[in-house]
Amino acid sequence: MTFDPHKKLYISDVTLRDGSHAVRHQYSIRNVQDIARALDKAKVDSIEVAHGDGLQGSSFNYGFGAHSDIEWIEAVAEVVTHARIATLLLPGIGTVHHLKEAYDAGARIVRVATHCTEADVSRQHIAYARELGMDTVGFLMMSHMTTPQNLAVEAKKMESYGATCIYVVDSGGALSMQDVRERFRAVKDLLEPSTQTGIHAHHNLSLGVANSIVAVEEGCDRIDASLAGMGAGAGNAPLEVFVAAAERLGWNHGTDLYTLMDAADEIVRPLQDRPVRVDRETLALGYAGVYSSFLRHAEVAASKYGLSTVDILVELGRRRMVGGQEDMIVDVALDLLRQRGDAARQAAV
């Protein structure tokens, strides 16, 4: 394909959805409005708003939110004039009824998210979103867990259901730049030319920005990023960093870099109760290929049972656990505890 450096990139901010993981879904109404105002001023194209695990994610399994999805969406709708409001829906957590409520509250874009090999479960939700007239996106999570060719087949399914944009989603922050290149080439080879593509990167191997740049070079249309990288694990591609890099490359991103830089440092970073960065634990996510939102759950389990968070995360990766299996984190911790006890008894013999 021919790369067009002058194409207008679609900047999709995820601070108010993926970023929710970094504050345990405790954004206040004032928080979301302050962040949304800054993003709107900077002229991002869309602002995703929801619990970190999407519509209806607020639960015992994923963590209760400080407010409902609808309250957050309505709050953002009150203060934005340029950006469109997006939301995330995981079939099995949210339903078409919840999507209609989000639409009524002001959401006009929905990203229907499934595991990278389970696009089949998105048919009803994608079709209904199109009926509502929403900008409908297929969101293939944990894309490192299948081959580029298989990912392309799943992308084609979502396209056939009505999605007009398909995302390669690196939920574990485990993809290398070559991995991204191969997946975009395979996906774009199978999709219709009119179907857009997007990249959702995580920064667990410090490749969030690099992988987003590679995706754009391969013809990607939409780029997810968040202020100060606010997101699960080591965070997403930091929005202000990606925009600075895009500016240096002469790409047309349409946003105001300095407004984004100010918002990242003055509004978002002070909200973090745990630094969003690459450290021992978040690096383990990318190394082991683990769903980034498992981090905080694994840290709680490690503290409760006197274990290493890294050991729990690596074992989750070995077992190929995926999003939605948060309840298994405690099971893994108990198994490790049992193994440690067995080893101690064996050593004492």
From Swiss-Prot:
EC number: 4.1.3.39
Sequence similarity: Belongs to the 4-hydroxy-2-oxovalerate aldolase family.
InterPro entries xref list: 2-IPM_HCS-like, 4OH_2_O-val_aldolase, Aldolase_TIM, DmpG_comm, DRE_TIM_HOA, PYR_CT
Gene Ontology biological process terms in this record: catabolic process; L-leucine biosynthetic process
Binding site for substrate: 17-18, 171, 200, 291
Active site as annotated: 21
UniProt binding sites for Mn(2+): 18, 200, 202
Family matches, as Gene3D superfamilies: 1.10.8.60, Aldolase class I (3.20.20.70)
Cited PROSITE patterns: PYR_CT (PS50991)
Domain annotation Pyruvate carboxyltransferase: ranges: 9-261
Signal peptide as annotated in the record: none
Site entry (Transition state stabilizer), positions: 17
Catalytic activities: (S)-4-hydroxy-2-oxopentanoate = acetaldehyde + pyruvate
Protein name as catalogued: 4-hydroxy-2-oxovalerate aldolase 1
GO molecular function, one term: 4-hydroxy-2-oxovalerate aldolase activity
Keywords: Aromatic hydrocarbons catabolism, Lyase, Manganese, Metal-binding
Highest taxon, organism lineage: Bacteria
PANTHER family named in the record: 2-ISOPROPYLMALATE SYNTHASE 1, CHLOROPLASTIC-RELATED (PTHR10277:SF9), HOMOCITRATE SYNTHASE-RELATED (PTHR10277)
Top-rank EC class of the record's enzyme: lyase
